[in-house]
Amino acid sequence: MKFAKGHGTENDFVIVEGTGPLPPEKVVALCDRRAGIGADGVLRIIRAGELLASGEIDELAPGINADDWFMDYRNADGSVAEMCGNGTRVFAHWVRSRGLLEEDTFTVGTRAGAKQVTVHSFSETEAEVSVEMGPAQVLGVSTASMAGESFAGLGVDMGNPHLAAVIPGLTAEDLAAKRLEQPVFDADFFPAGVNVELVTPLCDGVIHMRVFERGSGETRSCGTGTVAAACAALADASQVTGHVRVIVPGGEVEVEITEDGSTLTGPSRIVATGETSL
């Protein structure tokens, strides 16, 4: 099987094309960092109509046409994920740089709906991409605990569930020293599980964030999580809209929160291509 390896702010992915089956055990094998290629997840590039015909999705969401490219995203544990912001940037970079599309602005199908992307610049190995992420839907306040520490956060639906906890007085140095592990959360509030972000308060338009992702563990970045974190940080600062620079262990991205939507802008890198027997 041919594959590529890419990342968006070091949230890394194995990229595969084609309509062949992608069972959970294959995803786990590909993402294994010792016995496989190693990644936080798998980006499967497939036409939306082909995914529908295979029965892997029940219908095409509004705005997704049968001939649109669909990001079939899988977590490292083999589970299906609704959306991945960093993955969408890498996905868009791949289809644009490999000539699968000739336009710089196009629709990417996801299980969280149609996402408009703009590839601002690209080469075979590097790109800068914006993704229209849709509205950050605030679910309310919930709590969780991690490594013996309890905290309250803002529940945010970005097509996938997030609990973004802005911790008063938390510095970037304090955040870097924290131990992240499987969180204990309110399963009634988050019945499908949750991605948990720990966030520093907004300062001069900048926040720092770390994330423990559902199905992947701690990752170097999470695109949907940066939008959820920006939303929570703005709310903590008594703001509804704004532009936030989000610094994660793997780099930084720009998030714009408006009254009716959100935009995520950041880099994509393709670092390898090859073939695997997995």
UniProtKB/Swiss-Prot annotation:
Superkingdom of source: Bacteria
The protein's site described by Could be important to modulate the pK values of the two catalytic cysteine residues is found at 162, 213
Q: Per the record, what are the reactions this protein catalyses?
A: (2S,6S)-2,6-diaminopimelate = meso-2,6-diaminopimelate
Q: Which GO terms describe its biological process?
A: lysine biosynthetic process via diaminopimelate
Does the record bear NAD in its keywords?
no
Compartmental location = Cytoplasm
Family annotation (PROSITE patterns): DAP_EPIMERASE (PS01326)
**What name goes with this protein?**
Diaminopimelate epimerase
Please report the organism this UniProt entry assigns to the protein: Corynebacterium aurimucosum (strain ATCC 700975 / DSM 44827 / CIP 107346 / CN-1)
Q: What is the lineage of its organism?
A: Bacteria, Bacillati, Actinomycetota, Actinomycetes, Mycobacteriales
Q: Which gene encodes it?
A: dapF
